[in-house]
C-alpha cells in the first residue's frame, strides 16, 4: 500500500536538498558577473540572494544616491549600461540594470534566500538557508566586505528622544525630527547626506578629514581624459596587489576609506555644514566630541561604515575578520572563492567595471579544478547530465509538494 504522506515528505526532502557544481552566494553585481561566466562554461550552478528582488541592495539606499562612476564604467560583462557615456546613474537605475542583466542572460537567481551557514563535509561544501540544504563542489561568496552596519557601543546611551539612524537606514530628510542633526563619519556617505540635510536643519559633520579628489567628476577634464586614466588605467591596472603603489593604496583604503569623490569641502561649506571633531562618547544623553564638547541635537545619523558580516561562514579562513585569499582563491579551502571584496585584486575590484575581471579569474580556476578532478577519474570531460536542476525563485515555492 502506498503511503501518500511518505511520498509527499520524500518530494519535500528532495526539493530541500540539492547538489550543484557551484553555488554563488550574493546576487548583486559580483554574483551576476560570476554567473555570466559560469553559464558560458556550461556549469550547473545557482545564485542565492537574501533580497526579495534582484538589485534591492541598490534600491534600499538613500533616495538621492547616484553612482560615482559614469555609465561607461557601469556595465557588467557582455552588456553595457544603457545610458549616455558620461551619465551618472541613480541607484534605482543601477538596480533595474542588474535585474535586466539577470533576465537577459537567464541566470538562475534564487531570491529571498538568506544563507545561515556555510560549512564543509568531506569534499563538498554544505549550505544551510532556513530549511533549504544545498551541497556543492565550489562556492563563490560574491559580496563586499561591508555587510553589517557599524555603530559604536556608546550610542546606546543617547537620549531615546533623539532619532538615530545608520546611513543604511537613511532615505531622505523627512525621517528626521525638527532640530539639529549630527552626522558621525565624514566619508562619502556622511558628506553626501550632510549636504542634503543642511538646507533643512542645522547640521554638524563629525569625523576626520578623509581628503578629496582634486577635480570635479563630470567636468571637462574628467570627460576628456581623467575618467579613462583613472578608471581603466590607474584603478584597474596600476593599483593592484602586484605593485608596490597598489599594496600601499590597499592598506590605506582598507584602514581609512576613500577620499571624498563628488562632495568637496567647499560644497559642505556652501551648504552650511559645520565640521566638528570625532564623536567619542555620550554625556547626559547627548553626543560628546573629542575634546569634551557636548552637542544638543535632535538627530544622529551614523555614517560609520560596516562590519564584514561573514559570521555565517563556518570555516577557518579568517584573520581579524577578513577572509584570507589570493586573488579571490582560498587556498586553505579548495573550491572556495570570493568576488566583490574591496581591493580583492585591484582598486577597481569592488567597482562595477572591475568586478568582471575578478569573476572571470575565479571561474577559470573553478574550471581548472574540475578538469583536474575529471582527469584523476580517467575522464576527458564532464559526463553529460541526465537533467538540469530547476530552482524555485522564492522560498515559499520550495514547500510545494
Language model segments and positions:
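A short acidic, helix-capping loop that chelates divalent metal ions and anchors anionic groups
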Residues: 80-86
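Flavin (primarily FAD) cofactor-binding/catalytic cores of flavoenzymes
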Residues: 2-27, 32-51, 55-57, 86-401
Amino acid at each position: 500500500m502506498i503511503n501518500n504522506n511518505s511520498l509527499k515528505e520524500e518530494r519535500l526532502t528532495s526539493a530541500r536538498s540539492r547538489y550543484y557544481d557551484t553555488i554563488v552566494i550574493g546576487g548583486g553585481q559580483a554574483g551576476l558577473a560570476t554567473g555570466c561566466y559560469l553559464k558560458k562554461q556550461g556549469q550547473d550552478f545557482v545564485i542565492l540572494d537574501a533580497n526579495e528582488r534582484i538589485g534591492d541592495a541598490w534600491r534600499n539606499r538613500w533616495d538621492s544616491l547616484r553612482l560615482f562612476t559614469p555609465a561607461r564604467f557601469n556595465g557588467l560583462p557582455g552588456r553595457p549600461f544603457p545610458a549616455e557615456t558620461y551619465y551618472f546613474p541613480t541607484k534605482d537605475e543601477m538596480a533595474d540594470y542588474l535585474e535586466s542583466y539577470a533576465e537577459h542572460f537567464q541566470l538562475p537567481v534564487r531570491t529571498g534566500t538568506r544563507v545561515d551557514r556555510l560549512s564543509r563535509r568531506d569534499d563538498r561544501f554544505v549550505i544551510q538557508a532556513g530549511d533549504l540544504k544545498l551541497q556543492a563542489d565550489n562556492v563563490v561568496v560574491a559580496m563586499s566586505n561591508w555587510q553589517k552596519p557599524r555603530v559604536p557601543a556608546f550610542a546606546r546611551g543617547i537620549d531615546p528622544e533623539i532619532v538615530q539612524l545608520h546611513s543604511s537606514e537613511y532615505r531622505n530628510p523627512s525621517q528626521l525630527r525638527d532640530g539639529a542633526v549630527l552626522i558621525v563619519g565624514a566619508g562619502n556617505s556622511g558628506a553626501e547626506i550632510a549636504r542634503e540635510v543642511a538646507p533643512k536643519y542645522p547640521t554638524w559633520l563629525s569625523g576626520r578629514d578623509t581628503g578629496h579628489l582634486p577635480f570635479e567628476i563630470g567636468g571637462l577634464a574628467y570627460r576628456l581624459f581623467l575618467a579613462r586614466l583613472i578608471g581603466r588605467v590607474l584603478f584597474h591596472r596600476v593599483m593592484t596587489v602586484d605593485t608596490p603603489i597598489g599594496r600601499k593604496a590597499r592598506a590605506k583604503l582598507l584602514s581609512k576609506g576613500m577620499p571624498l569623490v563628488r562632495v568637496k569641502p567647499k560644497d559642505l561649506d556652501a551648504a552650511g555644514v559645520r565640521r566638528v571633531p570625532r564623536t567619542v562618547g555620550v554625556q547626559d544623553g547627548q553626543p560628546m566630541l573629542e575634546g569634551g564638547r557636548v552637542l544638543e541635537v535632535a538627530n544622529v545619523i551614523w555614517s560609520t561604515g560596516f562590519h564584514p558580516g561573514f559570521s555565517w561562514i563556518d570555516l577557518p579562513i579568517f584573520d581579524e575578520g577578513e577572509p584570507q585569499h589570493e586573488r579571490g582563491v582560498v587556498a586553505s579551502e579548495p573550491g572556495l572563492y570570493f568576488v566583490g571584496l574591496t581591493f580583492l585584486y585591484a582598486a577597481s575590484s569592488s567597482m562595477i567595471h572591475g568586478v568582471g575581471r575578478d569573476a572571470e579569474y575565479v571561474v577559470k580556476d573553478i574550471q581548472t579544478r574540475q578538469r583536474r578532478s575529471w582527469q584523476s577519474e580517467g575522464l576527458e570531460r564532464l559526463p553529460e547530465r541526465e537533467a538540469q536542476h530547476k530552482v524555485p525563485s522564492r522560498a515559499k515555492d520550495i514547500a510545494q509538494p
